[in-house]
Amino acid sequence: MPVSKQVIATEAITRKVDLDNPKVLAKLKKNMGHMTYGEPAWPNDLLFMFPVVILGTIGVIVGLAVMDPAGVGEPADPFATPLEILPEWYLYPAFHILRIAPNKLLGIALMSAIPVGLLFVPFIENVNKFQNPLRRPVATTVFLIGTLVTLYLGIGATLPLDKWVTLGLF
């Protein structure tokens, strides 16, 4: 008797699909009922696998930080100023716009024009309901030009002012 209860309990958890049942076959033809088999996420994944992965990741990060602490860079020297101070890499394009603008107010206006211009892209492309980028030429063109200009300004920010136009290639 306990063996049959064990088998029933196991079948209730795993739920194997009966492919001889015409109702199940009809559901599968309609792409319905495909989640009626397999191991349930609750409680197996949520109570066991997720905490193990999260705690394991935290353990690896803490272990690496304790065993080999990374240096932050050169120690600070308040009496030596670097020749050129650059921001972090993700701020290079904005820094370069400010650097090449003849007037700082114009540089701030140019930086403010970028998000304002991006706000208008959905309204320009509103007539096109496709999700494929090849069928949305305006949004794709704005994305490609914006990416190229951002890369150009980001690379140019690392060069001296007399070489940034050609990116030091010529």
UniProtKB/Swiss-Prot annotation:
GO terms for cellular component: plasma membrane-derived thylakoid membrane. SUPFAM superfamilies: a domain/subunit of cytochrome bc1 complex (Ubiquinol-cytochrome c reductase) (SSF81648). Belongs to the cytochrome b family. PetD subfamily. It comes from the Bacteria. The 4 large subunits of the cytochrome b6-f complex are cytochrome b6, subunit IV (17 kDa polypeptide, PetD), cytochrome f and the Rieske protein, while the 4 small subunits are PetG, PetL, PetM and PetN. The complex functions as a dimer. It is found in: Cellular thylakoid membrane. The keyword Transmembrane helix applies. GO terms for biological process: photosynthetic electron transport chain. Keywords: Electron transport, Membrane, Photosynthesis, Thylakoid, Transmembrane, Transmembrane helix, Transport. The chain crosses the membrane at residues 46-66, 105-125, 141-161. One of its GO terms (molecular function) is oxidoreductase activity. Component of the cytochrome b6-f complex, which mediates electron transfer between photosystem II (PSII) and photosystem I (PSI), cyclic electron flow around PSI, and state transitions. This is Cytochrome b6-f complex subunit 4. It is a multi-pass membrane protein. InterPro entries: Cyt_b/b6_C, Cyt_b/b6_C_sf, Cyt_b6/f_cplx_suIV, Cytochrome_b_C_euk/bac. The gene is petD.
